[in-house]
Amino acid sequence: MQLEPIDMRFGVVRKEDYSISVRKCHKKVLSTRQFSRRAKASVAFIVKRPGCIICKEEGLMLRELVQSFPENRVAAWAVVKEIDVDNDGLTALYQNYFRFPFFLDRKMKLYKAMGKNVINRFKFFYNIRKNGARKRIADKGIEGTFIGKGEGLILGGVLIFDAKGDICYAYQEKSGAEELPIEEFRCALNAIIADQESN
């Protein structure tokens, strides 16, 4: 399973000319100057559609979660399905909500490994109303629309890795409109960190 690094540091989406495995993506993120090998775990944000406000909310929530751990104990990175479809949405997600490394999964192998669940459009719009997603997101100051550009039917999720690169926790979106279970993620990260520090 190969992913391609994406460089967005200067407001331009540029794919690198090489690909690396998921485990190497995790290791590459941990070795960056930002984390300086202090991270005991990493959070991989598997993005449904970068331009949609649900993904912006998820990026913001995951960024706040990662930053709540002291001394860069937790690293973060993201995976997208495509580029050059909504580069404005992708750049906005990176610059305003989730400023961590991004990787391209052109063949969607990571999405397939997570079950490749497809959104039920009726359920999605029903859950937006039922869960109060519109108000919840507006209260966080996030602007945009629920419909973005590009492929948005295959749901995303979150993977949590330990320092060795083993997946210790996986979460897949159910309807695409629910709020992330951040406290579950926090418990999983605390358990991973405690386990690694006790060894």
Which residues are covered by each model-predicted region?
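A short, polar/charged loop-to-alpha-helix boundary motif
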Residues: 176-192
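Cofactor-binding loop segments of dinucleotide-utilizing enzymes, especially the Rossmann-like FAD-
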Residues: 48, 81, 163
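Thiol/selenol-based redox catalytic cores and closely related redox-interacting motifs
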Residues: 105-177
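Short active-site neighborhood of thiol/selenol oxidoreductases, capturing the structured segment around
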Residues: 33-67, 75-77
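A short beta-strand-turn-helix
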Residues: 8-42
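A generic fold-level signal
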Residues: 5, 38-39, 71, 153
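Cysteine/selenocysteine-centered motifs that mediate thiol-based redox chemistry or coordinate metal-sulfur cofactors
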Residues: 195-199
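Structural microenvironment flanking redox-active thiols in thiol-disulfide oxidoreductases
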Residues: 58-113, 119
